[in-house]
């Protein structure tokens, strides 16, 4: 890693994190698979939910022991909440259980698309900020909603790339890039819809600050390998963004300039 990228840490609410990858902890085939994926991706944070469900019904005690062993900062979420009251209550319960003021605020407005409820999201975010939480709201790429969330005290946003669990990658590149361009100083972490490492690399090349992954890793045939691949994709995309990519052109442009005679003719032309 170059000095340029090594000095470039993710900063949220004044705190710095070692990685721009955030990993969810749901739906892994086993606790060992989850543990291996965390070790492979070395995430800055891992998300946890009070309503967590894991395939195989693994004991909760083992799950929390695993998290303590990896010593990665926890980001509780309000997954499954559909009302403001439910989200606020769940956030307060999560603070008591996990001992942290961090909260990933999820408030779903549609069961089919799992799209966030923008009105309820703003109301819940405002209340939780007043209650002392560091709120990371899961939202769409809607610029106006993003600004309203910032107005009520959120210091970072988590816009989706596509609906949760679809793996489609970014379905509205224009909207997501406009959000980045219009909010240049706000930490933006793409959350939901990414399916393969190239999706993560792409949004990092656009200047996004990080990605949150769950299904793309947990439902891969080999989660540990996929987790490592995503971490590498995020690192490559961020490095490319910092390097300053060339501008795309509509016409061809020779990479080697033609100046004077070919080198083999410059000394009399003979071999």
From Swiss-Prot:
It holds the Pfam family ThiG. Belongs to the ThiG family. InterPro entries: Aldolase_TIM, Thiazole_synthase_ThiG, ThiG. Its EC number is 2.8.1.10. Pathway: Cofactor biosynthesis; thiamine diphosphate biosynthesis. 1-deoxy-D-xylulose 5-phosphate binds at residues 165, 192-193, 214-215. The active site is at 104 (schiff-base intermediate with dxp). It is an enzyme of class 2 (transferase). This is Thiazole synthase. It catalyses: [ThiS sulfur-carrier protein]-C-terminal-Gly-aminoethanethioate + 2-iminoacetate + 1-deoxy-D-xylulose 5-phosphate = [ThiS sulfur-carrier protein]-C-terminal Gly-Gly + 2-[(2R,5Z)-2-carboxy-4-methylthiazol-5(2H)-ylidene]ethyl phosphate + 2 H2O + H(+). Catalyzes the rearrangement of 1-deoxy-D-xylulose 5-phosphate (DXP) to produce the thiazole phosphate moiety of thiamine. Sulfur is provided by the thiocarboxylate moiety of the carrier protein ThiS. In vitro, sulfur can be provided by H(2)S. It is found in: Cytoplasm. GO terms for molecular function: thiazole synthase activity. Homotetramer. Forms heterodimers with either ThiH or ThiS. Keywords: Cytoplasm, Schiff base, Thiamine biosynthesis, Transferase. The keyword Transferase applies. GO terms for biological process: thiamine diphosphate biosynthetic process. Its main location: cytoplasm. One of its GO terms (cellular component) is cytoplasm.
